[in-house]
Design a protein with these regions (language model features):
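Hydrophobic (often cysteine-bearing) scaffold residues that line and stabilize catalytic clefts
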Residues: 15, 19, 58, 112
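Short, cysteine-centered beta-strand-loop-beta hairpins and adjacent loop/turn segments enriched
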Residues: 102-109
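Short, solvent-exposed loop/turn segments at secondary-structure junctions
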Residues: 100-102, 134-135
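Short beta-strand edge/turn micro-motifs at domain boundaries
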Residues: 94, 113-143
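Acidic/histidine-enriched, glycine/proline-rich intrinsically disordered or flexible terminal extensions
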Residues: 140-154
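A solvent-exposed, acidic/Ser-Thr-rich amphipathic alpha-helical stretch
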Residues: 35-101
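Short, low-complexity N-terminal intrinsically disordered segments enriched in polar/charged residues
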Residues: 1-28, 32, 36, 40
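Short, surface-exposed coil-to-beta transition loops
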Residues: 79-81, 111-116
């Protein structure tokens, strides 16, 4: 492998690792309820779409939405990110990051699973989320389970 090929490979590996770290930090800051740190992971015009409401656009709106989540006593979210697939395209990239989600709602243990459809952009201070779209496959009470007719025994 000649030097230019090696340099390109190292750049690709470094970019992919930086993007994986972006997704890990997102989960970490959700766990730690760190609103400002969460918002900083997004580009200035970044967007979050949970499919539960209209997409949230721009850092001020993201800050407000994340703060509401932190202030909600029922919003005990614990995401685990894994199986991250990334496609690079210069200073842009796209990816899918799968999540398992634990939470408590109305005093009940909840379990969720799904994935994020992400678009990333490289800025002067590193990789940022341009957009993050959450697709939940299920989010159910642990006791009920997610397969029809397979609720846990009392």
């Amino acid at each position: 492998m000649d030097a230019p090929d090696l340099e390109a490979l190292v750049r690709e590996l470094a970019d992919k690792e930086a993007i994986r770290e972006l997704a890990r930090r997102y989960a970490h800051h959700v766990w730690q309820l760190e609103v400002d740190a969460l918002v900083d992971l997004f580009a200035e015009d970044g967007e979050m779409d949970t499919s539960l409401e209209e997409p949230i656009r721009g850092r001020p709106a993201l800050r407000e939405a994340f703060q509401r989540l932190v202030d909600d006593d029922e919003a005990d979210l614990q995401p685990f990110v894994h199986n991250h697939v990334i496609e690079l395209d210069g200073d842009r990239a796209s990816g899918t990051a799968y999540i398992d989600l634990r939470s408590v709602r109305e005093g009940r243990s909840m379990l969720g699973s799904g994935y994020y459809r992400d678009r990333y952009v490289r800025r002067g201070d590193g990789w940022k989320f341009q957009s993050r779209g959450l697709v939940l496959r299920f989010f159910v009470p642990l006791h009920d389970g997610w397969a029809e007719g397979e609720a846990a025994e009392d």
